[in-house]
């Protein structure tokens, strides 16, 4: 009796019809494809994109040259050089991030005690040669100045979870 059931299952292609039923269910479902450059998906305030250096409202840069971000970076993508100022505070003379090495883990952002280095929502940047993707202090400050309002909103939205 069991052999007869097995014969009819394989002869009538029951397994294949079950598979086609699943395929048919999704074949006519609405598509969820996002046509990328024209349409963009919503981003979280915690999105980790292009790095930026921030300034205080009075215009002074936030980085105190503690070098915690350089020490915590697993990819060793951050290079910092600093000097002592007349008022006995340290400030950076060089702050470079090699975006080719960076793995966008966010450790630098978490390690920073003064929220100087942050990752923005910017994900569209490019370089035509390798050196174009090494961001200097001036470039990072320019990114921070350009997106400061968005960065402040994202930091405020994320504050309860920090």
Curated annotation (Swiss-Prot):
The places in or outside the cell where this protein is found are: Cell inner membrane
The cofactor required is: [4Fe-4S] cluster
> Where does it mainly reside?
membrane
Q: How is the cofactor bound?
A: Binds 2 [4Fe-4S] clusters per subunit.
Catalysed reactions, semicolon-separated: a quinone + NADH + 5 H(+)(in) = a quinol + NAD(+) + 4 H(+)(out)
Listed under GO cellular component are: plasma membrane
Q: Which Pfam families match?
A: Fer4_7 (PF12838)
Q: Which SUPFAM superfamilies match?
A: 4Fe-4S ferredoxins (SSF54862)
Q: Which residues are involved in binding [4Fe-4S] cluster 2?
A: 73, 102, 105, 108
- 4Fe-4S ferredoxin-type domain: residues covered: 53-83, 93-122
What are the recorded GO MF terms, alphabetically?
A: 4 iron, 4 sulfur cluster binding; iron ion binding; NADH:ubiquinone reductase (non-electrogenic) activity; quinone binding
Q: How is it placed in the membrane, per its record?
A: Peripheral membrane protein
Q: What is its EC number?
A: 7.1.1.-
Superkingdom of the source?
Bacteria
- Binding of [4Fe-4S] cluster 1, residues: 63, 66, 69, 112
Keywords attached to this entry? 4Fe-4S, Cell inner membrane, Cell membrane, Iron, Iron-sulfur, Membrane, Metal-binding, NAD, Quinone, Repeat, Translocase, Ubiquinone
Q: Which InterPro entries match?
A: 4Fe4S_Fe-S-bd, 4Fe4S_Fe_S_CS, NADH_quinone_OxRdtase_chainI
Q: Name one GO biological process term.
A: aerobic respiration
Function, in words: NDH-1 shuttles electrons from NADH, via FMN and iron-sulfur (Fe-S) centers, to quinones in the respiratory chain. The immediate electron acceptor for the enzyme in this species is believed to be ubiquinone. Couples the redox reaction to proton translocation (for every two electrons transferred, four hydrogen ions are translocated across the cytoplasmic membrane), and thus conserves the redox energy in a proton gradient.
Instruction: Share what the entry says about its subunit structure, partners included.
Output: NDH-1 is composed of 14 different subunits. Subunits NuoA, H, J, K, L, M, N constitute the membrane sector of the complex.
PANTHER family per the UniProt record, alphabetical: NADH DEHYDROGENASE [UBIQUINONE] IRON-SULFUR PROTEIN 8, MITOCHONDRIAL (PTHR10849:SF20), NADH DEHYDROGENASE UBIQUINONE IRON-SULFUR PROTEIN 8, MITOCHONDRIAL (PTHR10849)
Which family would the database say this protein is a member of? Answer: Belongs to the complex I 23 kDa subunit family.
Q: What is this protein called?
A: NADH-quinone oxidoreductase subunit I
Q: Which organism is it from?
A: Nitrosomonas europaea (strain ATCC 19718 / CIP 103999 / KCTC 2705 / NBRC 14298)
Q: Which gene encodes it?
A: nuoI
């Amino acid at each position: 009796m069991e052999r007869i059931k097995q014969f009819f299952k394989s002869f009538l292609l029951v397994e294949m019809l079950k598979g086609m039923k699943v395929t048919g269910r999704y074949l006519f479902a609405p598509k969820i494809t996002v046509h990328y450059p024209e349409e963009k998906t919503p981003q979280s305030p915690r999105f980790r994109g292009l790095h930026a250096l921030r300034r205080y409202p009075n215009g002074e840069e936030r980085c105190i040259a503690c070098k915690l971000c350089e020490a915590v970076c697993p990819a060793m993508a951050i290079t910092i050089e600093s000097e002592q100022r007349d008022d006995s505070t340290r400030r950076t003379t060089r702050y470079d991030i090699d975006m080719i090495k960076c793995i966008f883990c966010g450790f630098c952002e978490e390690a920073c005690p003064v929220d100087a280095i942050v990752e923005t929502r910017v994900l569209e940047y490019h370089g035509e040669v390798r050196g174009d993707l090494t961001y200097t202090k001036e470039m990072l400050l320019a990114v921070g100045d350009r997106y400061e309002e968005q960065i402040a909103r994202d930091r405020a939205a994320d504050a309860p979870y920090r």
